[in-house]
Amino acid sequence: MPELPEVETVKRGLAPAMEGARVAKLELRRGDLRFPFPDAFADRVSGRTIVSLGRRAKYLLVDLDDGNTLISHLGMSGSFRIEEGRIEEGAGAATPGEFHHARSKDEKHDHVVFHLESPAGPRRVVYNDPRRFGFMDMVGRADLAAHPFFRDLGPEPTGNELGAAYLAERFRHKAQPLKSALLDQKNIAGLGNIYVCEALWRAHLSPIRAAGTLATAGGRPKEQLNLLVASIRDVIADAITAGGSSLRDHIQTDGSLGYFQHSFSVYDREGQACRTPGCGGTVARIVQAGRSTFYCATCQK
């Protein structure tokens, strides 16, 4: 499933094509994805101008000129592609943030098509989703924070609200494993399995230690928590710069691949040498809450 850096890559890839464009027609080729589309969805979007694109956690946000926001989640296999001009079906397409194998480009999985008009000419932005785990919704922009998708989300990992003092208060007295606490979207929004593993390695913290051990009894952060916050920020920033992780043919708008996977220090490196200088340990894989965790037991304590 795409994590925050991959969704941010999608947003940045789509923005030049979609921002300022008018949706001449929203074409729905089926009645649902993971969930049914909102009532009169196509009619409510058609004719509107796209003001801006945004992101909250792992959700793509499309702000419209009538004060509504279209919400899109890519699920397991969703992707958008941009088709420039009046071109042959599938020709000349660019794919900003693709997280599945090339076989998934089969046009029978094209479920939503934005027919756009802009000064640069006509475009189509096509949503393709073979497994249909993605979904779309619509909400008034003023009500976005109260929407069920967002109302319980914690702060963004790169935002000013995230700090050691905040996490110390959230983790205080908790016996929950540290990795599980970091994956809890109520604590931090948008963090996923890959980048939690990488951030914990950078901070030299074990994924299985109790989250509460990083805070004092009075709820103050220990120094290790300051390092963890810095590591989270750094790993997310590095992944966004790299265009995300191409575990399954992730392609950016210009056709280039995300390459952060080449910088993985622990994720998917079971049995390989730890990259911490002088460590000498080996990356291990364990399962926590049904997910693979990769870490070095020698230097992560």
From Swiss-Prot:
DNA binds at H109, R131, K174. InterPro entries: DNA_glyclase/AP_lyase_DNA-bd, DNA_glyclase_Znf_dom_DNA_BS, Formamido-pyr_DNA_Glyclase, FPG_cat, MutM-like_N-ter, Ribosomal_uS13-like_H2TH, Znf_DNA_glyclase/AP_lyase, Znf_FPG/IleRS. Its EC number is 3.2.2.23, 4.2.99.18. Its cofactor is Zn(2+). PROSITE patterns: FPG_CAT, ZF_FPG_1, ZF_FPG_2. Disulfide bonds: none annotated. The active site is at P2, E3, K58, R291. Binds 1 zinc ion per subunit. A zinc finger (FPG-type) spans 265-301. Gene3D superfamilies: 1.10.8.50, MutM-like, N-terminal. It catalyses: Hydrolysis of DNA containing ring-opened 7-methylguanine residues, releasing 2,6-diamino-4-hydroxy-5-(N-methyl)formamidopyrimidine; 2'-deoxyribonucleotide-(2'-deoxyribose 5'-phosphate)-2'-deoxyribonucleotide-DNA = a 3'-end 2'-deoxyribonucleotide-(2,3-dehydro-2,3-deoxyribose 5'-phosphate)-DNA + a 5'-end 5'-phospho-2'-deoxyribonucleoside-DNA + H(+). Keywords: DNA damage, DNA repair, DNA-binding, Glycosidase, Hydrolase, Lyase, Metal-binding, Multifunctional enzyme, Zinc, Zinc-finger. One of its GO terms (molecular function) is damaged DNA binding. Pfam families: Fapy_DNA_glyco (PF01149), H2TH (PF06831), zf-FPG_IleRS (PF06827). One of its GO terms (biological process) is base-excision repair. Monomer. PANTHER family: FORMAMIDOPYRIMIDINE-DNA GLYCOSYLASE. Involved in base excision repair of DNA damaged by oxidation or by mutagenic agents. Acts as a DNA glycosylase that recognizes and removes damaged bases. Has a preference for oxidized purines, such as 7,8-dihydro-8-oxoguanine (8-oxoG). Has AP (apurinic/apyrimidinic) lyase activity and introduces nicks in the DNA strand. Cleaves the DNA backbone by beta-delta elimination to generate a single-strand break at the site of the removed base with both 3'- and 5'-phosphates. Belongs to the FPG family. This is Formamidopyrimidine-DNA glycosylase. It comes from Rhizobium leguminosarum bv. trifolii (strain WSM2304). The gene is mutM.
